[in-house]
C-alpha cells in the first residue's frame, strides 16, 4: 500500500470510512506483498515474518481492524511459491483468523490460480 507502513496505516482508515459512510464498499489492494509492477506475476516474495508484519501488513491490518473495510483484492505475486491469494498463512491465518476479516476477498483480473486450492484457503 505504500513505502511507509505507518503513514499508510494512518491514511487508509479515514479514506475507507469516508467511502463506506456513503453506502459504498471500499476495496483495498493488493493483499499482500505486491512489491513491484513490472513482471509482478513472476515475483515470489519471501519476507521474514517480522518484515511481513512490520512492513507489508500494517496498512491492511488497519483497514480491517480500524476501518472495517468491506472489500479486499489479492495480489498477483507468489508468497513462498504459492499464489498469494491461495496462501493459508496470509488469508486464513492472518487476514481471516487473527484480524477477523469477514468481507469479500477477490482476485485481481487474470490471476492464474487453482480454484480448488483458492477455495480451500479462504478465497
Question: What do these predicted ranges mean?
Answer:
Residues 1-123:
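Glycoside hydrolase catalytic-domain context in secreted enzymes
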Amino acid at each position: 500500500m505504500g513505502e511507509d507502513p505507518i503513514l499508510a496505516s494512518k491514511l487508509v482508515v479515514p479514506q475507507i470510512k469516508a467511502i463506506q459512510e456513503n453506502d459504498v464498499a471500499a476495496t483495498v489492494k493488493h493483499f499482500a506483498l505486491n512489491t513491484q509492477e513490472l513482471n509482478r506475476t513472476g515475483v515470489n516474495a519471501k519476507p521474514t515474518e517480522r518484515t511481513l508484519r512490520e512492513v507489508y501488513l500494517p496498512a491492511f491490518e488497519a483497514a480491517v481492524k480500524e476501518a472495517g473495510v468491506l472489500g479486499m483484492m489479492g495480489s498477483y505475486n507468489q508468497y513462498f511459491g504459492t499464489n498469494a491469494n491461495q496462501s493459508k498463512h496470509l488469508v486464513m491465518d492472518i487476514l481471516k483468523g487473527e484480524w477477523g476479516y469477514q468481507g469479500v476477498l477477490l482476485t485481481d483480473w487474470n490471476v492464474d490460480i487453482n480454484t480448488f486450492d483458492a477455495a480451500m484457503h479462504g478465497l
